[in-house]
């Protein structure tokens, strides 16, 4: 429902959550184990929803919106209690990352964003601290949720392949086919003998073609005999239209394919597939690469890691040692260092960070200047490059994500039901 989605959006985008109310006189709306939800907690969200001026499709039931808000607060309380019971702690770095990301999305500096938060409630000196606390609570909830779902979700290759095949089949609708055909036209008044003769001619033509006879040469020959044949060359037509003209199961899958004889409205057709165009093909550049990685750690700061990788780069350039020596003795990627830093074929899109123009024009066996990624500092060596159609790879990933999202929704619901079944929940009607 739209209303549930928006409540979820509000809770997370405004970074609102119910904090314990100390020494505050208020009506208790619900008890969740040893925690309480106050009437003011529910009303605070309801006021926000009204101020947002969003239009909701709400059933006639007068308390529907209030009940949905309360239901969300109960679930959040259960999740937070579960996180606390598992002793989940959030670091200052994690909170700082959230603040940086919010500021980045708003296209402002972190300091400017902090000032915005403080200006929302100048009279309350602890407002910013409460804001930070709310971020911490949300991160706790997300951490325990991710942990639980990771335990519960299993995805089999068969499940992914089922969706993958459906996506590929759906994509067939977007195919365009370049065809040439020879038509042996029929007339309503044709005798049985004429039909048999025409069928025999068509079958002989197909037999010759499958034995290697040149289709273009045959087109020229048939064009001369206009009383028997109609010829059409090199035209594009959507696969869906071709199937509608003949039959739904017509399977066109490769260039040079000969189809026929096929019965159509106007007679017997012999088709040749000249080309196939996938509307959604996705050509990407892949690089065959090795790398040397230096990772920041508890004992090595990012600045020190950067200095170390640039020293390695300079030493390779000066010939003090080779790239392979650096990988074997200095790289922090222990898995690939035993394979000379071999990363295999990787597209620039899958690396997870932007490559500069200098990198993209490197020659084979040339090393890159140090590059920063989420994992640390790299020196890459380009062994080869190629262009590939990533369509099927993308569709496989899409299929996996569809299955994953379905399971996330399903398993999250199961998990919440498990939390409810083992909890004491009392809703107090006023």
From Swiss-Prot:
Gene3D superfamilies in the record: 3.10.50.40, Porin chaperone SurA, peptide-binding domain (1.10.4030.10)
UniProtKB keywords: Chaperone, Isomerase, Periplasm, Repeat, Rotamase, Signal
Chief location category: periplasm
Signal peptide start and end residues: 1-20
UniProt key word Signal: yes
Classification via InterPro entries: OMP_Chaperone_SurA, PPIase_dom_sf, PPIase_PpiC, PPIase_SurA, SurA_N, Trigger_fact/SurA_dom_sf
GO cellular component: outer membrane-bounded periplasmic space
Function as written in the Swiss-Prot or TrEMBL entry: Chaperone involved in the correct folding and assembly of outer membrane proteins. Recognizes specific patterns of aromatic residues and the orientation of their side chains, which are found more frequently in integral outer membrane proteins. May act in both early periplasmic and late outer membrane-associated steps of protein maturation.
Record-given protein name: Chaperone SurA
Species name: Buchnera aphidicola subsp. Acyrthosiphon pisum (strain APS) (Acyrthosiphon pisum symbiotic bacterium)
């Amino acid at each position: 429902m739209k209303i549930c989605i928006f409540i979820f959006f509000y809770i997370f985008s405004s970074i609102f959550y119910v904090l314990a109310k100390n020494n505050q006189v208020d009506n208790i709306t619900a008890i969740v184990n040893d925690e309480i939800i106050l009437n003011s907690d529910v009303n605070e969200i309801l006021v926000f929803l009204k101020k947002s001026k969003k239009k909701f499709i709400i059933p006639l039931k007068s308390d529907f919106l209030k009940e949905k808000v309360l239901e969300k607060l109960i679930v959040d309380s259960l999740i937070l209690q579960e996180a606390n019971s598992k002793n989940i702690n959030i670091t200052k770095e994690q909170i700082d990352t959230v603040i940086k990301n919010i500021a980045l999305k708003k296209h402002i500096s972190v300091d400017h964003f902090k000032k915005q938060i403080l200006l929302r409630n100048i009279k309350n000196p602890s407002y910013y601290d409460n804001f930070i606390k709310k971020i911490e609570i949300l991160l706790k909830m997300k951490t325990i949720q991710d942990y639980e779902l990771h335990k519960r979700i299993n995805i089999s290759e068969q499940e992914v392949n089922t969706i993958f095949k459906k996506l590929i089949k759906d994509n067939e609708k977007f195919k365009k086919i370049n065809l040439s055909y020879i038509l042996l036209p029929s007339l309503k008044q044709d005798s049985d003998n004429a039909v048999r003769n025409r069928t025999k001619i068509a079958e002989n033509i197909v037999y010759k073609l499958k034995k290697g006879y040149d289709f273009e040469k045959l087109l020229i020959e048939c064009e001369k005999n206009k009383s028997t044949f109609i010829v059409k060359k090199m035209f594009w037509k959507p696969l869906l239209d071709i199937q509608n003209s003949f039959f739904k199961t017509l399977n066109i899958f490769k260039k040079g394919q000969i189809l026929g004889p096929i019965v159509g409205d106007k007679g017997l057709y012999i088709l040749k597939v000249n080309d196939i165009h996938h509307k959604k093909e996705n050509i990407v550049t892949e690089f065959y690469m090795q790398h040397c990685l230096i990772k920041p750690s508890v004992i090595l700061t990012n600045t020190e890691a950067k200095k170390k990788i640039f020293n390695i780069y300079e030493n390779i350039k000066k010939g003090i040692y080779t790239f392979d020596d650096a990988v074997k003795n200095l790289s922090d990627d222990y898995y690939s260092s035993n394979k000379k830093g071999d990363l295999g074929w990787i597209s620039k899109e899958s690396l997870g960070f932007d490559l500069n123009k200098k990198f993209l024009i490197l020659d084979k066996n040339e090393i890159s200047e140090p590059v920063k990624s989420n994992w640390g500092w790299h020196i890459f060596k380009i062994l080869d490059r190629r262009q590939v159609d990533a369509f099927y790879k993308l569709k496989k990933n899409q299929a996996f994500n569809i299955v994953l999202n379905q399971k996330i929704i399903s398993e999250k619901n199961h998990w919440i039901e498990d939390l409810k079944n083992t909890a004491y929940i009392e809703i107090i009607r006023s």
